[in-house]
Regions:
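Beta-sheet-rich non-transmembrane sensory/scaffold domains
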Residues: 1-208, 273-381
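Extracytoplasmic electron-transfer domains, predominantly the class I c-type cytochrome c fold
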Residues: 207-210, 214-217, 222-292, 299, ...
């Protein structure tokens, strides 16, 4: 996983050891054998969402036991299983630096060879969708008010584009491996989102509802959204309110403390913060002002800047703002460290009806490779 808070790391200066990494442990002793970090000082929620594949790679006539790790960034890291060293060279490349006060982003990020980068990783006016003249014009007008550029653009006070978005690239589904051909099959989403940061410090007096709103924005909006859900499987704020309205307060607080399903626990929250977050979700506590000095805050005081959430970036008709393909399936030759082929994955029937070729779609799932040479995948959304 990544270090918290996801989008501001001024209280965790440095690379953040063991976050965003592949970790090899000796199963007999529990001792660390090696680790390899794929993102330094993550402020993009670019955690490793899926386990690596155990693979073999042939180099100079020798078979090497290795692992292949897909990522949300669309980087494939291929590492020697014994040593953790990259089989194909990884370069530390300078990336843009944060302008948020107190934040110290790491100056470089690890990039595998371009032949092992299988996602779109840049969004400027040059990459804008050409689906219709009206859509292109609207997107470009929006972009002129935003930070744009290459991957690892840090969140700032101004809206910043993120491509791949926070769900990838590759997400939970992972990859499939053909051990005969030594080929890895990995699907990928190519859709942009945007993010910005706001000051989080509560005023001297604040209602329980408003304090809960600030906490929700920092802790919950990235999955549950402000209105619509951001992550598949996470109920939207609207749906969440309908569910929680019928639940005892103690039950809601138990979920905050212990987590449930895919939701992690938020045991760091003080009792005051739990009550405020519950009040916001239940839409009460708007009238009574709380004295800031009397509140016990463990989280709200620690994070001076919070994200506005993982915000969808669509054209006026609801389609992705960047050029297709918006979803792909790639076959990667692990001996050569390069993409054999890349196919468009998914389609919008309404766009096909207009005469457009399949564009691909956002996808959440993984492929299966068979011994008979077939690859099966659903995953499209």
């Amino acid at each position: 996983g990544s270090s918290t808070y996801d989008h501001w790391g001024g209280n965790r200066i440095g690379k953040n050891l063991f976050a965003n990494c592949i970790l090899a442990l000796n199963a007999r002793t529990g001792e660390r054998v090696w680790h390899y970090q794929v993102v330094h000082h993550d402020i993009w929620d670019y955690d490793l969402p899926c386990p690596p594949n155990l693979v073999q790679v042939k180099q100079e006539g020798k078979i090497i036991d290795a692992i292949a790790q897909p990522t949300k960034m669309g980087h494939l890291f291929v590492l020697d299983r014994e040593s953790g060293q990259p089989i194909f060279p990884v370069e530390e490349i300078p990336v843009p630096q944060s302008t948020i006060p107190g934040e110290e982003t790491w100056p470089t990020q690890p990039f595998p060879p371009s032949s092992l980068r299988y996602a779109q990783q840049r969004f400027t006016e040059e990459e804008v969708s050409q689906r219709t003249p009206a859509a292109t014009k609207a997107i470009k007008e929006r972009l002129r008010k935003m930070q744009t550029g290459d991957i690892f653009l840090p969140p700032g006070l101004k809206d910043a584009v993120t491509l791949p978005q926070f769900n990838g690239g590759t997400d939970w589904g992972g990859a499939a491996y053909d051990p005969i051909e030594r080929t890895l099959f990995v699907n990928c989403s190519n859709e942009a989102e945007w993010i910005s940061m706001n000051k989080a410090e509560p005023p001297k007096s604040i209602s329980r509802f408003e304090l809960g709103k600030q906490l929700y924005r920092g802790l919950c909006a990235s999955c549950h959204g402000h209105e619509l859900a951001r992550n598949p499987g996470a109920p939207s704020l609207t749906d969440l309110r309908q569910v929680v309205a019928n639940q005892p307060v103690e039950h809601v607080r138990s979920i905050l403390e212990n987590g449930k399903g895919q939701m992690p626990k938020f045991a760091v929250l003080s009792t005051d913060e739990q009550e405020a977050l519950t009040a916001f979700i239940r839409e009460n506590g708007k009238d009574k002002l709380l004295n800031r000095a009397s509140l016990q805050l463990s989280y709200a005081d620690a994070i001076p800047y919070v994200a506005t959430g993982h915000n969808e970036f669509k054209d006026p008709d609801g389609f992705p703002v960047n050029q297709p393909p918006w979803g792909t399936l790639s076959a990667i030759d692990l001996d050569k460290g390069e993409i054999k082929w890349q196919a468009t994955l998914g389609t919008y029937p309404e766009l096909e009806a207009q005469g457009l070729a399949p564009t691909g779609t956002f996808n959440m799932g993984g492929p299966i490779a068979t011994a008979s040479g077939l690859v099966f995948i659903g995953a499209t959304m």
